[in-house]
Amino acid sequence: MNKKKVLAVALALVATTPSLAEKAIDDSSKVREIDEVIVISQPKEQFLLRHQPLSSNVYAAGQMMNLGVRDLRELSSFVPNFAMPNYGSRYTSSMYIRGIGSRINSPAVGIYVDGAPLINKSSFNYHHFDVTRVDVLRGPQGTLYGMNTEGGLVRIYTKDPMNYQGTDIKLGMGSHGYQLLEASTYRKLNSKSALMLGGFYSGQNGFFRNEFNGQRADKYREGGGKMRFVWRPGTQWNISLGAHYEYTDQNGFPYGKMDLEHNTTANPSTNNQAKYRRNLVNSALCVNFKGNCFDFNSTTSYQYLKDFMRMDIDYMSTDFLLMEERQLQNAFTQELVMKSNRNRFWQWTQGGFFSAEWLKTNAPVYFGSDMNKFMSGTIRNAMYNAMVRSMSARFMRPGVTAEQAQQQAKDMIERQGGVNLDINLGTVPGIFRTPSYNLGLFHESSLNLTERFKVTLGLRYDYSHLSIDYLTSAKMTSLANIMGRKATSSIMSTLQNKAHNSFNQLLPKVGMSLDIDHVGSNIYAVVSKGYRAGGYNIQMFSDILSAELQKNSSQRGDYTVEHDAKAYKDIENTISYTPETSWNYEVGAHLNLFDHKLQLDLAAFYMQVRNQQISVMAGNYGFGRMMTNAGRSSSSGIEASLRGQAFNNNLSWMANYGFTHAVFKEYVDNVSTTGNMKAMDYKDKKVPFIPAHTFSASVDYRIPFNSMLKAITIGANVNAQGKTYWDEANSYSQAFYALAGAHATADFGRITVDLWGRNLTNTKYNTFAMGSLATGKMYYFGQRGNPFQCGIDLKFHL
C-alpha cells in the first residue's frame, strides 16, 4: 500500500463517518469538550478553549494512547499546522506553528507543564509520563504568556492525585529493541492531601547504523522519576508541589549524505560518534486561592539542566570538525495572577511574571587532521599564487606572453624547493555565560456586551535583559618551507569581553466572539501581536577566530592578534540578533453539529513577521549554526478540525488539516559561492522547515463485551505533511508523504493489552536536511524518518 492509498483510505473513513453519525442520529453519542471532561484549574482564562477567540486542539490521555503518542514530537503529527520533527536527539526541540518556528536559541512556541513554563529550549523534548491532557494553542499568546509564544503555546497537564487513585504499571516492548516501563501510584493521605510517586525507564536500539564504526547511530536509554503532593487545607485553597527528574543517554544526530539527483539519503558515516546526555529537573509550587470575587494564583518554579553533546559537524568519516557542548542551567520563575470569578458583564485577568535564567555553556571546537590539511592547502595555494603573480611581473618583457612569464615563475619556485606549509589549528575552547531576565505585566478583559456577543481586550508589557560574558581563543601554528627557507610561526587570538542588551515590547490583543446558536457554536475574530526575544550566537566565535587566523596567516614568528574597543563592538554586532515581532489576523468558528455528535473548528489567518529569525550555517566555514534576521516575511493559511462520535459513543473519529503559505517578503543575504561572497535575494521564497500541508485522521471502534473481557478497540490512523523546503533558496525539499498506523486494544478492566504498529507501509522520507560547507565543499545531509515498527503495551491498574 503506497502513501496515496493510505490517504485514500483515511479520507474514505472520514467521509463515511459523518453519514454513519446521521444514520445513528437517535443514539446517545455526544462529543463533549475535553476541557469539560478533564477539568484543569486555569488561573488565566475565563472560558473553555472553544469559547475563546483562538484556534486550538485538545488531546486526552486515552486519545493519545490510541494514537501511540509517547512525546510531543509524535503528538505534533496529529495537530494541524504544528510540526516538531523527530530528528537529532532530545537536545533538538525545533517547533513550528503557522510558519513561525525555531531550530536554535529563543523558541517561538512556549511550553507549560502543570502551569509552570519551561525556560530552556533544550528541556522541551522529554518523555511524556503520567500525562492526562495536552492543549495546543495556535497563534500569538503573548498577552497572557509573554515572549517566545509567538507561534503558539503547548500546555501539558499530569494527573492530580486528589482526583485519580490507584497504581498504574505499564510495560512495553517492540521491534528495534524498544522497551518501556512506567509505574506510578496515586494515594490520598487523608481528606485534605494526596501524593503521587512514579518512575519510568525507556530504551531503544535505534533504526540506523553508523557505517564507519558499526554502532547504532540513534540508540537511547532514559529514565527518571516524579512526585506530586497536593494539599487542600480548606475549601478555598489548593496547594500543589511537583518535581520531575529525567536522565537521557543516547547516540544522536544520525545524519547521512544526501544524493539530491536520485533523492536518496545514506546511512550516517562519521568517525566521531555523536552523543547526548542530559540531567533534567523541573519543579513547581502552585498556590491557588478562590475568593468571593476573584481567584488568586501563585506559581513558583525552578529548573535545572546539565547536559553534554558531542557532534561530528562535518558529518563525514573524514576528520574535519568535532564540536562539544556542555550546558549548565539554573532557572527560576515566579508568576502572580488574579482573575474575576463572577459571571458578569466585565470579567478580567491580570498579573505579573518574572524569570531569571543563568546559563553557562562550555563549547570547544576541535579541528582534525583533515581540516589542518585543508587549511594548509588553502593558505599554501594563496601564498603560491601571490608569489607567482609577483615573480611573473619581473619576467615580462617584449616577446614574452603572460602565460610564459607565469610558467617561468613557477619553474623558478619549484627549482628553489617549492612552497610547502603544514598548519595545526588544534582546539578552539569557549566558555560563555549568558544570563537573562524577563519581566511581564499583563491585563485582559472580557466584556459581555450581549448574551451572545463578547469582546476581549488585552495588553502586556514585556521587558527582557540579556548579557554575555565570553572567553575563547584560537591558535594556529605553522611550519613553512618556502623556496628552501624554513620558518615556524604561531598566531594567537583571544577574545574576552562582556556585552548586554535590553528589549521591551507592548503586546496587545483584540478579540470578538459571537454565539450563533444555543448549543455553544460561535464565530470569532482576533488581532494579536507576537514577540520572540533577541540574543547572541555563541557558535559564531569559531568562525570569527578562524577568519582572523587566516587573515593574519602571512605574519612571521609569534604573533598575537590585538583587539580594541571597536573590534569588540564589531564582534558584538556580528554575534547578536534582534527580536522578531509579528501581527496575527485571524477569523474562525467553533461549531457543534448534529446534536453534539460532530464538532467542527475552522480558522483562517494572516501573519506579518518583521525581523524573522532564521537559523543558518555560521559564516564561511560552517562550524555551527547561527541565528540571523530576515527582513520581512508573511504567513497565511487555514486550519480545520473535525471530531465525531457515533453508535452510543463506541465509534470515535477525528480529522485535521492545515495549510501554511510562509514566504520571505524582504530578505537579502551574503552567501559564499566558490570562495566568493555574493548577495542573494530570497524574496518570495518559501520559509524553510515549514510543511505547506499537514493532515491527520484517526478512527477507533469499541466493541463492548459482558465478560471478563470488557471491550476490544480497533483503530487506524494516518498523518501526512509536506512539501517542506530545507533552505532559504528552496533548492531542495521533502515531498508530501503519509504515514499509517494501527492498534488493537483488549480491555480486561484492570489489565489492558495494546498491539500497535507505526509506519505500516514503511514509507521513506526525511525528517530533517541541511547543507554544510565544513569541508570546503557543499554537501547535503539528512536524517531519514523512522521505518516500520510494531510492539505491544501492557497496562495494569491496581
Question: Can you name each region flagged by the protein language model?
Answer:
Residues 31-65, 93-94, 109, 134:
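N-terminal periplasmic "start-of-domain" segments of outer-membrane beta-barrel proteins
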Residues 37, 359, 372, 531, ...:
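C-terminal beta-signal and adjacent terminal beta-strands/loops
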Residues 72, 95-99, 112, 148-170, ...:
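N-terminal periplasmic accessory domains that precede
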Residues 114-140:
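Short acidic/polar hinge/loop motifs at secondary-structure boundaries
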Residues 166-168, 173-204, 208, 212-250, ...:
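Transmembrane beta-barrel wall of Gram-negative outer-membrane proteins
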Residues 209-215, 253-269, 314-321, 364-429, ...:
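Solvent-exposed loop segments that connect transmembrane elements
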Residues 286-311, 522-526, 539, 545-628, ...:
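Membrane-embedded beta-barrel scaffold of Gram-negative outer-membrane proteins
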Residues 339, 343, 349, 353-355, ...:
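Gram-negative outer-membrane beta-barrel transporters
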